[in-house]
């Protein structure tokens, strides 16, 4: 079935969707949990953390595992461990080819990531081939996003589309966009934004996703990989 609305822009999440940083998050968090005799992190917990701003995710981990540390201490540990591994992250299957294809077709593309600027640079400085293709990049610590308004709120997508419209002097509407996501909070935020959602969960997450059809509610598609995207279905 062909998508009923012409797609005029594509907006992307980053972690676990374009690059394999979700696996690095799991590795480093398990190292932190092991220090306190806790863990390992299981997908029923991780699925609720995906796409959340760092402080909110950290708060939930501390509460769930009853860690005897403050949020600042937790963050300090994780940042130190993660910074050693970001340089090893790589594009997930189909991601780089999709970005190149959309650029070739002159489809405006925005990156809207919950990662802050520091983490974004650490994760992507060796992957310029793909990230230099974006027309605009919005990070989770952008001051224009009010505190407490990260995913599942739609603000980051609204800001990404606003920047695309300003750059190209267009008036693209949310329902003329596709949002690409891997996490449940991100899917909820994309739906609240009003876009069609391409949901590509981590392969190990499928057992804990719940009722995916109810979550998408006819406003999206679940794929096992970005390689499975049928461009013709969306007029791309």
Swiss-Prot record:
Statement: the UniProt record of this protein carries the keyword Oxidoreductase: no
InterPro entries given in the database record: Gpp1/Gpp2-like (IPR045228), HAD-like_sf (IPR036412), HAD-SF_hydro_IA (IPR006439), HAD_2 (IPR041492), HAD_sf (IPR023214), PGP-like_dom2 (IPR023198)
Presence of keyword Hydrolase: yes
One of the Pfam families matching this protein, by short name: HAD_2
Documented EC number(s): 3.1.3.96
Keywords annotated in UniProt: Hydrolase
Enzyme class: hydrolase
Catalytic activity of the protein: XMP + H2O = xanthosine + phosphate; psi-UMP + H2O = pseudouridine + phosphate
One annotated GO molecular function: XMP 5'-nucleosidase activity
NCBIfam families: HAD-SF-IA-v3
Function: Nucleotidase with XMP as the best in vitro substrate. Low catalytic efficiencies of YKL033W-A observed with XMP and other substrates suggest that these could be secondary activities for this protein, and its primary substrate is not yet identified. May possess pseudouridine 5'-phosphatase activity and together with dTTP/UTP pyrophosphatase YOR111W might constitute a pathway for the detoxification of pseudouridine 5'-triphosphate (Psi-UTP) and -monophosphate (Psi-UMP).
Family: Belongs to the HAD-like hydrolase superfamily.
Official protein name in the record: Probable pseudouridine-5'-phosphatase YKL033W-A
Taxonomic lineage of the native organism: Eukaryota, Fungi, Dikarya, Ascomycota, Saccharomycotina
